[in-house]
Amino acid sequence: MAGRSGDSDEDLLKTVRLIKFLYQSNPPPSNEGTRQARRNRRRRWRERQRQIRTISERILSTYLGRPAEPVPLQLPPLERLTLDCNEDCGTSGTQGVGNPEILVESPTVLESGTKE
């Protein structure tokens, strides 16, 4: 399935069925009763949904050996990022790709808004 190496299709299907069963075991609350009773039922339902989501993530990481979501990309602080066009930038859209330059002392880009 979907080109996953190392994962058998049966394990993936079994995991998906288990997670589907968890979500089906918590149907949305009914619309009967007073406003306060409905609000309490929705609050408890949302809490159960959060617990099911947490359990599902743990099941995915345990059975499939990987997290449910990709690891976020670590970026340097915004203060250190600059656009440096001292060299001939050219008109090509791909020039300089793959070689990002990070200057430690960045020039002031935004000033007070007054021209000198």
UniProtKB/Swiss-Prot annotation:
GO molecular function terms noted in the UniProt entry: DNA-binding transcription factor activity; RNA binding
Alphabetical list of Gene3D superfamilies matching this protein: 6.10.140.630
Gene Ontology biological-process entries: mRNA transport; viral process
Record region (Homomultimerization): 18-26
Motif Nuclear localization signal and RNA-binding (RRE), residue range(s) on this chain: 34-50
Alphabetic keyword roster: AIDS, Host cytoplasm, Host nucleus, Host-virus interaction, Methylation, mRNA transport, Phosphoprotein, RNA-binding, Transport
Superkingdom of origin: Viruses
GO cellular component, one term: host cell nucleolus
Keyword hit for RNA-binding: yes
Post-translational modification: Asymmetrically arginine dimethylated at one site by host PRMT6. Methylation impairs the RNA-binding activity and export of viral RNA from the nucleus to the cytoplasm.
Ranges for region Disordered: 23-48, 92-116
One Pfam family here: REV
Disulphide-bonded residues: none
Compositionally biased tracts (Basic residues): 36-47
Compartments where located: Host nucleus, Host nucleolus; Host cytoplasm
Modification Phosphoserine occurs at: S5, S8, S92
Keyword Cell membrane recorded: no
Locus of motif Nuclear export signal and binding to XPO1: 73-84
Similarity comment text for this entry: Belongs to the HIV-1 REV protein family.
Subunit note: Homomultimer; when bound to the RRE. Multimeric assembly is essential for activity and may involve XPO1. Binds to human KPNB1, XPO1, TNPO1, RANBP5 and IPO7. Interacts with the viral Integrase. Interacts with human KHDRBS1. Interacts with human NAP1; this interaction decreases Rev multimerization and stimulates its activity. Interacts with human DEAD-box helicases DDX3 and DDX24; these interactions may serve for viral RNA export to the cytoplasm and packaging, respectively.
Function description: Escorts unspliced or incompletely spliced viral pre-mRNAs (late transcripts) out of the nucleus of infected cells. These pre-mRNAs carry a recognition sequence called Rev responsive element (RRE) located in the env gene, that is not present in fully spliced viral mRNAs (early transcripts). This function is essential since most viral proteins are translated from unspliced or partially spliced pre-mRNAs which cannot exit the nucleus by the pathway used by fully processed cellular mRNAs. Rev itself is translated from a fully spliced mRNA that readily exits the nucleus.
Domains (record comment): The RNA-binding motif binds to the RRE, a 240 bp stem-and-loop structure present in incompletely spliced viral pre-mRNAs. This region also contains the NLS which mediates nuclear localization via KPNB1 binding and, when the N-terminal sequence is present, nucleolar targeting. These overlapping functions prevent Rev bound to RRE from undesirable return to the nucleus. When Rev binds the RRE, the NLS becomes masked while the NES remains accessible. The leucine-rich NES mediates binding to human XPO1.
Other observations noted: HIV-1 lineages are divided in three main groups, M (for Major), O (for Outlier), and N (for New, or Non-M, Non-O). The vast majority of strains found worldwide belong to the group M. Group O seems to be endemic to and largely confined to Cameroon and neighboring countries in West Central Africa, where these viruses represent a small minority of HIV-1 strains. The group N is represented by a limited number of isolates from Cameroonian persons. The group M is further subdivided in 9 clades or subtypes (A to D, F to H, J and K).
Protein name per UniProt: Protein Rev
Organism the protein comes from: Human immunodeficiency virus type 1 group M subtype B (isolate JRCSF) (HIV-1)
